[in-house]
């Protein structure tokens, strides 16, 4: 038992003795000893049994079958029909990778295709940016053009307003009705600037028509309007008479001379009436001359009034020129204007014998207005 297993195996004497003693065993088995025989021989010696098992494993190593090889994996990039234009997300660090000899790339299982064209996204992003920049530049230029246009329009408007104040309007139907007029006293005054104040006062000033209403017609001295203001006295002693609409009441109280000898509503007046409102609508005072009283000659006031007839095609109004009616209570109720207001000695139509006809503006006239 003191011998080792290696010494036992290499001892030639032990092998010879075993052959001589077991000659019949060797003769019967011409083949090499099997593993079972070796194990049986070494069973008596436990140390030699381990060596015998290792030797048997070396001898039988060529006969053992190898594990079957894995089936070749198909590269998903090569099998895909979209690989020419699309990327393939086929690489994952958590999965074992495979090398494809065809595309010469490593790939792993679990990859998916991404439907993104190669280089397509960059091209699409550049075009909208250029269009946006162009639109922003164009939009930045537009406000400047608008500002210049607005300033030019304002300058043109101011220039036209200056010319309009000192030049008559070019309306052929109205003639000089809306244009500027010039008198020695008033100078050149625009119609829109002075409105009726420039026509009726010595010192014209801008008057708002809506604010002043009826008070703007004849509130200054030496103003001759359609209605004679009530004043106790005659023209022989009074040099300045306030003529105008007396708050809508055209009363003639003891006044011997009026602007127009139209309708007289009472009192001892020798004239001084009211014009028809419809006539006022058709009549505009264009040129107006003021004449003072002359104590040495005739002591009468002369008013020059220009009659302007609108175009019948434009307004379709009936013009009454040679008719006159008088209802004046007194001795001088003639319908003729003192001093010949018209150039041809015409008459002013003073219609309406009652206050209703006066306020309505049409009175008892047989002709009606076509616009109403």
Swiss-Prot record:
It is found in: Nucleus. Its main location: nucleus. The keyword Transcription applies. Disruption phenotype: Disruption of interfascicular cambium formation and development in inflorescence stems. PROSITE patterns: ZF_DOF_1, ZF_DOF_2. GO terms for cellular component: nucleus. Keywords: Activator, DNA-binding, Metal-binding, Nucleus, Transcription, Transcription regulation, Zinc, Zinc-finger. This is Dof zinc finger protein DOF5.6. It comes from Arabidopsis thaliana.
